[in-house]
Regions:
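Conserved beta-strand-loop-beta-strand hairpin that lines the nucleotide-binding pocket
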Residues: 1-16, 58-138
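Bergerat-fold GHKL ATPase/HATPase_c domain
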Residues: 1-48
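Conserved ATP-binding N-box helix of the HATPase_c
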Residues: 41-66
Length: 138
């Protein structure tokens, strides 16, 4: 069963890891996702989207404070879907949103990519931060 009460499916593999909240850890997140989802057809998309959420955690939340960090949860239903959740120190009130950056801007496209490539995505506040997730279905 999934770890999420709002979604009843049979999850065949679940992986969780905590990462320090530093920029260099985004590369570690990418490698972690690639390792755990190596046989998932959309592994490239899952890796990219997870790195975008991890980057947001490090750049826009208290997850980057000394001693803080963020968690990555991967739920994989073989041959069907993957759901990745990034649990960071984000605000209870400030939800992430898809920005409309200027055409020549170097930043602000992370959630645009998530919105474009994921089957679904969302974010909700918890008592310990914010969980932002995406789903990719085959």
């Amino acid at each position: 069963m999934s770890l999420h009460a709002d979604r009843i499916t049979y999850t065949e593999s679940v992986h969780h890891r905590w990462f320090p909240g530093t920029v260099d850890q985004v590369a570690q997140v990418r490698a972690y996702v690639r390792d755990k989802l190596s046989e998932f057809p959309a592994v490239d998309d899952a890796e990219l989207l997870t790195s975008e959420l991890a980057t947001n955690a490090v750049q826009h939340t208290p997850s980057n404070l000394p001693g803080a960090g963020f968690g990555v949860l991967i739920e994989h239903e073989y041959g069907k879907s993957v759901r990745v959740t990034v649990h960071d120190g984000g605000s209870y009130f400030d939800a992430p949103y898809v920005a409309q950056p200027e055409p020549d801007s170097e930043h602000g496209r992370g959630l645009f990519l998530v919105d474009a490539l994921a089957t679904s995505w969302g974010s909700h506040a918890t008592l310990s931060g914010r969980k932002t997730w995406f789903c990719i279905e085959n």
